[in-house]
A protein has these predicted regions:
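Catalytic core of nucleotide-sugar-dependent glycosyltransferases
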Residues: 1-157
Length: 157
């Protein structure tokens, strides 16, 4: 039996060795079809995207729409999407997910850039995959990490 999930997202429960977790197939299909490239956009697991105001959302979506031949994979809360459904539906090149396997997306050959908050894990995964970053630090160590990333030639802020 195939389950479109990831064991990391499941609670402890009885299971069977006949279950195969196949979560992430949708992002793989998007990336495979992104012949002109894809950009990953994530501010990590601690950032609450429901706090983004309408002006910020419109700015982000407007920028993404201008690059219609590039696919954008955005980690964004479903509440944010549902509250702004028309805006998200108007950009067929923007693909929203509440969760995805970030290293797998970064390691895909069609991933061209990573818009990130510069959390330590994101910076490390991006460097390992060789994907340039566009850093937008929000709090904590992210400001330092972003400076280190820029200094080391991993991207810009």
């Amino acid at each position: 039996m195939f389950i479109n999930s990831n064991p990391f997202l499941e609670l402890t429960r009885p299971t069977s060795n006949k279950i195969i977790y196949i979560g992430g197939l949708k992002t793989r299909k998007i990336l495979d079809e992104a012949k002109k490239g894809a950009v990953l956009f994530s501010f990590g697991s601690l950032t609450d995207t429901t706090k983004l105001n309408e002006r910020m959302l419109k700015s982000i979506m407007g920028a993404f729409r201008r690059f219609s031949n590039i696919h954008f994979i955005w980690k964004v809360d479903n509440v944010t999407v549902n509250n702004n459904l028309k805006m998200f539906e108007s950009a067929p090149n923007v693909h929203n997910f509440e969760w995805f396997r970030q290293p797998a997306i970064l390691e895909h050959p069609n991933t061209r850039a990573f818009i990130t908050h510069c959390g330590q894990n994101s910076l490390t995964e991006s460097a390992r995959a060789g994907v340039p970053i566009i850093g937008i630090p929000l709090f904590g160590d992210q400001f330092y990490n972003c400076i280190v990333g820029e200094t080391r030639g991993l991207g810009v802020q």
